[in-house]
Amino acid sequence: MKKENSLKKAKDFQKVIDTRQSVGCKSFVIYYLKNELDYARIGISSGKRLGNAVIRNRTKRQVRSIIDLTFDKNRSLYIIVIVRNKFLEQDFENNLKDFKYLLSKLNKNL
């Protein structure tokens, strides 16, 4: 994921979450908001309840690779992916399948 495609600031996260537009499943919650840019900006959040820093960073790396495999970054959206505890209990393929399912739900809502 390129640097220009990432959401980092807390105010950007809050702006997207305040819209309350979301889709969710057992492994992820995705908050989204349309933007005026020609590309998507994506933020990943994994809470402290998920585990220690090593586990949280590993899950973020896995989510980034899932996003690189499945998501079209040329869409004009802000997206925040929140990782749930069930993510750790599943293997990569099942998490990938869950993320694809959420993207299909997101496409129906847009």
Q: Which residues make up each language-model segment?
A:
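Positively charged, solvent-exposed patches that mediate nucleic-acid binding
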Residues: M1-L110
